[in-house]
Every structure is written in C-alpha cells, then in structure tokens.
Swiss-Prot record:
Protein name per the record: Cytochrome b-c1 complex subunit 2, mitochondrial
Transit peptide (first-last residue): 1-16
Subunit structure: Component of the ubiquinol-cytochrome c oxidoreductase (cytochrome b-c1 complex, complex III, CIII), a multisubunit enzyme composed of 3 respiratory subunits cytochrome b, cytochrome c1 and Rieske protein, 2 core protein subunits, and additional low-molecular weight protein subunits. The complex exists as an obligatory dimer and forms supercomplexes (SCs) in the inner mitochondrial membrane with cytochrome c oxidase (complex IV, CIV).
Intracellular or extracellular location(s): Mitochondrion inner membrane
Chain's role: Component of the ubiquinol-cytochrome c oxidoreductase, a multisubunit transmembrane complex that is part of the mitochondrial electron transport chain which drives oxidative phosphorylation.
Family according to the record: Belongs to the peptidase M16 family. UQCRC2/QCR2 subfamily.
GO cellular component assignments: mitochondrial crista; respiratory chain complex III
Name of the gene this protein is made from: QCR2
InterPro entries according to UniProt: Metalloenz_LuxS/M16, MPP/UQCRC_Complex, Pept_M16_N, Peptidase_M16_C
Membrane-spanning segments: none
Source organism: Debaryomyces hansenii (strain ATCC 36239 / CBS 767 / BCRC 21394 / JCM 1990 / NBRC 0083 / IGC 2968)
Topology relative to the membrane: Peripheral membrane protein
Length: 376
C-alpha cells in the first residue's frame, strides 16, 4: 500500500504555518504551497529558479521515481515554478488522497536530498529549456527588460536562470535553508476541509520546518530609462512606471479608465488601438503600471504606442472618477484563491490621479520602425 501519512509528528511548529482552506463540491482537491521571499527577486540571479526544479526530486523519504509512479497511480498532478516573489508548488488530486499529497509537499520543503548529479542531469536542463522557451517570446523579453531598467536588482533580476553565472548545489541548498521556513510558507487548499488539512499538516514533515523571519528585499524605483532590443518576430512596445504598493489603487483606476487587460470589450481608449492593453503588475514590495502594444507589424505598434501615450495623457479627473467601479471589477477578476489581491478601490483612488510625466520605455522587435521614448 502507498504511505498516506507521515509517521512522525511535529504539531507545535505546524501551528506557525499560514493555512487557508475552503470546501468545494465534487471529488477534486487542489493544494498549493506558496513560499514567499523565495522568488527570483531573492538571492543570486537564477538560484530560485534552480531550486524550483529540485522540488519533487529525490528526498529522504522516497525517490523521485517512486513519488512519480505513486502520484500517477493516484491520478495526481504536481508542478513547481518560480515567480518574482515566490516559489509555488501545486498539486491536484482526488479528495481521499489529501494525506498523501500533504506528506509529499512537506517532504519537498524539509527532506529534499539535493544530490550533486541531479543538477547537471535534471535541474539545469529543465531550467534552461524553460528559459529558452520563454526567450522565444518578444513579449517576455520586453517585460524582462522593463523589470530590469525599472528595479535593477531584486525585482529586476531575470525571472529564469540564464546560465550566465554558475550556481552550485551548495548555493541552492543554502538558499532553500533560508527560504523554507514557517514565516515564508503559506498553504492553500481548495476542495479541502480545513480541520483535516490542519491535522494532516501537523502529522507531516511540514512540522519540521524551522522558524524564521521574512527577509524583505530592498526596492529602488527608477524612471526615465529606455531599452531597445532588435529581434526577429513580432514587435512589442512597453510604457512602464514603477510604483509603490500604496499607489496600486490609483493606477488600477487609471488602467480601468484607459483600458485594462482584465476588462476586454470595454469602450475605453486602448480598446480602439490594435494589440494595446494596460495592467498593474503587483508584487509584495512594489509594482509596475504597464501599457503594452504588440503586433506582428512594427508600423502598427509604432502608431499604436504613440496613440496609447496620447490616450493616457488625455485622461481627465471625470474619466478617473467614472472608472472606479470598473477598477473594482478588474481587481476582483485578478484575485485568485491562492494569490489574493488586497487592493482597496474607493473614491480617494481617483482624487490623486496617477501621472505619467516620467516613465520607462522598452521596444523589442523591428526597432528600426519603433519610436524612441522622446518621440511618444
């Protein structure tokens, strides 16, 4: 029989782990572990991405092969990925198998073996393949460049490992020991009874997580920068403003007023420009207000980004006031159970309008046809 519950119990430490659970109809459950302050913004560039690829490999409890076969036999699906803020582990399975997958996730956080041969044989190939696939998108290149010029370090680090600087197994192991602690770990369960989840976590290796403090990464906001990248394929132009967390609400109102990516089909100005959207990228310590214009035709992008800049400059106080309800809806649409968005939209968000007097600009693609920032 498959082992469904860890034999050891560390219930006192488990009480420090942040748990959120909700029951749902049907026989399917999902369990997500979010490790905050463990994303690409933290540590050496690329180390978080490589750590995410070590997850679900060999650990002290069982081999990667055994876990893969067992989880497949149970019909489970597992994944591990990195964001700028966090490492996120996700599992999907039948409800009755909750103890097994709680145990598996706890083993990842506390018992991963970090064997030397896994780095060149499994981890590096997987990480490099993911980066190569992402780099095939000019939009990805543009957003990476925008983060780099807007934040430089931290949130400006590359999202994925690019092979520029070698990273050792010891460096990955050290990063894991600093990131995987009770202050950083949150568990979200859907289709899960909260009492059951607490019980199984208390009986699993989750309880072996050490106590720790959440380290904040210093954030610097830089404006007035420009980046141009010549690349084959479609063209992309980005206007971006790095913003403080306190300003998320007013930039959500501005986004709704000109045309938010979360509100397609509206009559907002950007909806009249081919390939144009706006959004607010929100992180724990800062964010980015972004206007994006993409098209296979660079001339269309050139015309579109100029029109988009004109549209945002033309937004009136009345437009912002009228957009507050739309902004509330956009925020609600962004909020997910595993990643709640805590931004309060009210009338005050429209009283101090967001400004685009200074901004960062990125052009990727056929840059011979794309305008410079001072031409917008």
């Amino acid at each position: 029989m498959l082992s469904r519950v860890s034999a050891r119990s560390y219930s006192s430490a488990a009480q420090s782990i942040k748990l959120t659970a909700r029951e749902a109809p049907g026989n399917l459950s999902t369990l997500s572990v979010v490790v905050n302050n463990a994303g690409s913004k933290a540590g050496k560039s690329g180390v978080a991405h490589l750590l995410s690829k070590y997850n679900f490999l060999n650990n002290e409890a069982k081999s990667a092969l055994r876990f893969t076969r067992e989880s497949e036999l149970l019909g489970g699906i597992v994944s591990s990925d990195v964001t700028r803020d966090s490492i996120v582990l996700k599992t999907q399975f039948l409800k009755q198998d909750l103890p097994y997958f709680v145990e598996a996730l706890g083993n990842v956080l506390t018992k991963t073996s970090f064997r030397d041969h896994e780095l060149p044989e499994t981890v590096l190939p997987a990480a490099k393949a993911q980066n190569a696939e992402a780099q095939g998108s000019n939009a990805f290149k543009a957003f990476e460049s925008l983060h780099e010029i807007s934040f430089r370090k931290g949130l400006g680090n590359p999202l994925y490992y690019d092979g520029t600087s070698p990273i050792s197994v010891d460096e990955i192991k050290q990063f894991a020991s600093e990131a995987y602690n009770t202050s950083n770990v949150s568990v979200f369960g859907s289709g899960v009874n909260e009492g059951d989840l607490k019980k199984f976590i208390g009986e699993s290796a989750f309880s072996a997580l050490p106590a720790g403090s959440s380290k904040t990464t210093p954030v610097e906001l830089h404006n007035g920068k420009e980046s141009r990248i010549r690349a084959a394929g479609g063209s992309v132009a980005l206007i971006g403003v790095p913003i403080k967390t306190a300003d998320f609400a007013k930039y959500e109102v501005l986004s709704a007023a000109i045309g938010s990516t979360y509100l397609p089909g509206s009559s907002a100005p950007l909806s009249q420009i081919p390939g144009a959207i706006s959004k607010v990228l929100k992180y724990q310590d800062a964010g980015l207000f972004v206007i994006c214009v993409c098209n296979s035709d660079a001339a269309v992008v050139a015309q579109g980004v100029k029109a988009a800049k004109k549209a945002v400059d033309s937004v009136s106080a009345s437009d912002l006031s009228s957009a507050t309800k739309a902004a509330e809806l956009a925020v609600a649409l962004q909020s997910r159970f595993e990643s709640p968005v805590d931004v309060k939209i009210d009338a005050s968000a429209a009283k101090s309008p967001a400004k685009l007097s200074e901004f960062n600009y990125v052009a990727v693609g056929n840059v011979d046809l794309l305008p410079y920032a001072n031409e917008l």
